Amino acid sequence: MRLNIPTCLTLFRLIIVPFFIIVFYLPFSNASFYSAIIFILAALTDWFDGFLARKLNQTTCFGAFLDPVADKIIVVIGLILIIEYFHSFWITIPSLIMIIREIIISSLREWMAEIGKNNLLSVSLISKLKTSIQMLAIFSLLWKETYIIIIIGILSLYVSSILAFLSMLKYFYIAWRDLFRN
């Protein structure tokens, strides 16, 4: 297998995960800033690898598999770190909604692929919006530099969790007949 640029970017996103976690826990005053920077770098490579794969016509089966895996790993770890840091019901609930949604949708996509209908669950506009706001939420709550940034992060977290739930309902609506046929 030859690695192309988009796949290398996706692999880079996976490679930086341990550094993301380590930097988050470093006992330095600006460790939160650096962990937020690593997270946003991962988010940018997510956008950029998809853009390049389409632009350069370098989509591969391996890349199509690995990209969502890398996305889920960095987002779920970011949410877990935020839950751990804030120790708050108000942060935990929307974060868990998003984590559970990711697991459910990944399972639904896998099942739809098994029955030959994976093309029905293409990424929706609401999911793209959810992802953008989710990235802002995680970045802000990792950085937590000022009260305003934390408020922006919390508001973004709630908006993205609502969008996550709504997009999950949309995916279930699309798959409904297949899920409940005899």
From Swiss-Prot:
Keywords on record: Cell inner membrane, Cell membrane, Lipid biosynthesis, Lipid metabolism, Membrane, Phospholipid biosynthesis, Phospholipid metabolism, Transferase, Transmembrane, Transmembrane helix
Membrane topology of the entry: Multi-pass membrane protein
Record carries keyword Repeat: no
Annotated TM spans: 13-37, 61-81, 87-107, 146-168
Catalytic activity from the UniProt record: a CDP-1,2-diacyl-sn-glycerol + sn-glycerol 3-phosphate = a 1,2-diacyl-sn-glycero-3-phospho-(1'-sn-glycero-3'-phosphate) + CMP + H(+)
Signal peptide: none
EC primary class: transferase
A GO CC term assigned to this protein in UniProt: plasma membrane
GO MF terms held by the record: CDP-diacylglycerol-glycerol-3-phosphate 3-phosphatidyltransferase activity
InterPro entries: CDP-alcohol_PTase-I, CDP-OH_P_trans, CDP-OH_PTrfase_TM_dom, CDP_ALCOHOL_P_TRANSF_CS, PGP_synthase_bac, Phosphatidylglycerol_P_synth
Location in or out of the cell: Cell inner membrane
EC number in record: 2.7.8.5
Chain ranges on the Cytoplasmic side, renumbered to this chain: 1-12, 82-86, 169-181
Pfam families for the chain: CDP-OH_P_transf
Pathway linked to the protein: Phospholipid metabolism; phosphatidylglycerol biosynthesis; phosphatidylglycerol from CDP-diacylglycerol: step 1/2
GO terms, biological process: phosphatidylglycerol biosynthetic process
Biological role stated in the UniProt entry: Catalyzes the conversion of cytidine diphosphate diacylglycerol (CDP-DG) and glycerol 3-phosphate into phosphatidylglycerol. Essential for the synthesis of anionic phospholipids, thereby playing a role in balancing the ratio of zwitterionic and anionic phospholipids, which is thought to be important for normal membrane function.
UniProt-listed PANTHER family: CDP-DIACYLGLYCEROL--GLYCEROL-3-PHOSPHATE 3-PHOSPHATIDYLTRANSFERASE 1, CHLOROPLASTIC, CDP-DIACYLGLYCEROL--GLYCEROL-3-PHOSPHATE 3-PHOSPHATIDYLTRANSFERASE-RELATED
Family statement drawn from the similarity comment of this UniProt entry: Belongs to the CDP-alcohol phosphatidyltransferase class-I family.
Listed name of the protein: CDP-diacylglycerol--glycerol-3-phosphate 3-phosphatidyltransferase
Name of the gene: pgsA
